[in-house]
Amino acid sequence: MPCFNPHMLTLARESRGLTQSELAAATNFGQGTLSKYETGMLAPPPEAVEALAAVVSYPAEFFYQAGQSYGFPPFHYRKRKKLSAKALGKIVAEMNIRRMHVQRLSLSYEMKSNRFIPEIDMDEYQGRSRKRPTLEDVARSLRETWMLPAGPVANLMELIEDNGGIIIPCDFGSDLIDAMSQRIDGLPVLFFVNVGAPADRVRHTLAHELAHMVLHTTTFKDDDEMEREADDLAGAFLLPAEEVRSQLRRFDLRQLANMKSYWKVSMASIAVRAERLNLITPYQSKMFWIEMSKLGYRKREPNEPPQEQPTKLRRMVEYHQRKLGYSDDDMAKLLFLTVTEFKRMYAPEPPLARHLRLVN
C-alpha cells in the first residue's frame, strides 16, 4: 500500500488558500497534530485522511501520490515580494499540481519535437564575433534559430509550444503576477499563465518568462539584473530594433496604437522599448506615463489583440479521452482530482481574457 505523502497535504492545503490553523479548525484536529502530519512526524490514520480530503476537496488518493513540491526559481524573487504568504503558497501549489498533471499525462503521450528552448550562458556565448554578445544579439539569434520572418511574432504561445514548451492556463487568484515558468529535468519547459490577464500584457510577460528560461536557468545573478535582462530580451525579441526605429517616426498615442495593432504588444511595452533604444527622451517618456495614468491605461489598455490560446495540454487530455478511451471519471482518477474539478480545469476553456475597445 502506498504511503501517506506529507508534501501533498501541504500542497492541498495551500492550493485552497488555507493556513494550517484554518485547516485544523475546519477538520477539528489540533494544529499540533496537523503540523506533525505535514512534517511527516506522524502518519494520519485513514479516517483522518478522509476528513482532510473532504475539507480540501481532493480525493483521498491525492495524499498518497509520490513526488515533491518545487518553489519559485531564484529569478522570480521580486515577484515573491509582491505577495502575501497565503497568496504565494496558492500560486506555488497551483504550479506544482499542474506540473504533476503534465508528468502523469506524459506517461501515455509521446511529445514529439525536434526543436527546443535553448539555454544561453552570456559569458560563454560568442555568436558570430569575438566580442561579448548583447541581448540584441541573443534575440536576433533566437529569432534566426526558430526561423522567424521579419515583423511581429504571429502567435507567441504557438511558437513556444512548437519549440518544446507547454503553456498552462492557471488561476493564480491575484493580478499581481501574469505568468511564471519552470525548467525541470525530464519535463518540457513549463509556462504558467494567469487567466484573465490582458492579451497584450500576456505576450510581453510570456516573452519575459521565455527570456528567463533562455538566460537564467544555468547562470544566476542579482535579482534586479535578471529581471532587467529578461525584460530587455523580451523587448528585443518581440520588437526588433531596426524595425522599431523605422516605424517610430513620431511618439504619441495614435502612433503607438497603430504600432500596437501591428506588433500585438502593449503601448507601454513599445514605449519602454523606444526608451531603451534611445528613440525618445526621458521627458517624452515621463509625459507618456502621465497621459497613460490619466486615461486609466496603465492597468488595462484599449484595443487588445486577439487572445492567444495554448493547445498542447489540451491535446494531451484529448488524446487520453479520444484515443485511449478515458472517461471523465478516469481522467479525474489519473490526475487525483474530483470529477468536478477535472471539468473545471480541462473542459474546453473560454478565452483567457476579455477585450476592450477604444471608444472615440
Language-model segments: which ranges?
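Active-site hotspot residues in diverse enzymes, especially metal/ion-binding acidic/histidine motifs
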Residues: M1-N360
